[in-house]
Amino acid sequence: MTRAGMERWRDRLALVTGASGGIGAAVARALVQQGLKVVGCARTVGNIEELAAECKSAGYPGTLIPYRCDLSNEEDILSMFSAVRSQHSGVDICINNAGMARPDTLLSGSTSGWKDMFNVNVLALSICTREAYQSMKERNIDDGHIININSMCGHRVPPQSVIHFYSATKYAVTALTEGLRQELLEAQTHIRATCISPGLVETQFAFKLHDKDPGEAAATYEHIKCLRPEDVAEAVIYVLSTPPHVQVGDIQMRPTEQVT
């Protein structure tokens, strides 16, 4: 059933980065349920293809279009936006969800690990934002929306050393979203910018961060009832369903039992 306020987005196009699992997959599914055309991108698209088939079998009114894209490569990103332009006219909603964490501390971490996180969490997000805005501008889209899936780590620094550089990239996302809001205002457009900052969400995140210690990864999710990816997707739908004159700048959400 279409959510109140989502009718105006029906048949319009949303780009969701990092759509192969976790929050990205949940967001892509929720948007298809609301009748949108969704381009879901990731480095590997097998999971997105399966999700697209599930959405079709379920009879959802929208469509999920898998697209292979390495977000650490600017040429890949530009090619994706070019393909969206030629095949679907352009992007109306950009959801920068893709993120990367490496267990590289500030005192002994590898430069390559830092670069990997910065390239995906900051640069790719910024490139997608720029290209999405240009796509909207060239088609005179004045009601588009750019949503950055951030983290509570972008608002406070946790004590775990393996998350400190990642936290720095998420602080950057907080600043970039507010800077984007200001620039959109200066451009005299009604395109909106929103940051959604979840706390602990039960995904593969901890298993990728602690890939050498799956026991520690599992323990991350066992001590409290975590958020689900669908909870974050629900926040995305809420933001999109607000009237065009309403600017939701940031949603900070965490499990009820999470302390910080």
UniProtKB/Swiss-Prot annotation:
Pathway: Steroid biosynthesis; estrogen biosynthesis
Active-site feature positions: Y166
Cleaved signal peptide residues: 1-30
Annotated substrate binding sites: S151, Y166
E.C. number(s) listed in UniProt: 1.1.1.270, 1.1.1.62
Activity regulation (record text): Inhibited by flavonoids including apigenin, luteolin, genistein, kaempferol and quercetin and also by carbenoxolone, zearalenone, glycyrrhetinic, curcumin and flufenamic acid.
Binding residue positions for NADP(+): 18-23, 43-44, 49, 70-71, 97, 166, 170, 201-204, 208
Gene Ontology cellular component terms for the protein in this record: extracellular region
Short name of one Pfam family: adh_short
PANTHER family attached to this UniProt entry: DEHYDROGENASE/REDUCTASE SDR FAMILY MEMBER 11, DEHYDROGENASE_REDUCTASE SDR FAMILY MEMBER 11
Subunit structure: Homotetramer.
Name assigned to this protein: Dehydrogenase/reductase SDR family member 11
Species: Mus musculus (Mouse)
Lineage of source species: Eukaryota, Metazoa, Chordata, Craniata, Vertebrata
Gene that produces this protein: Dhrs11
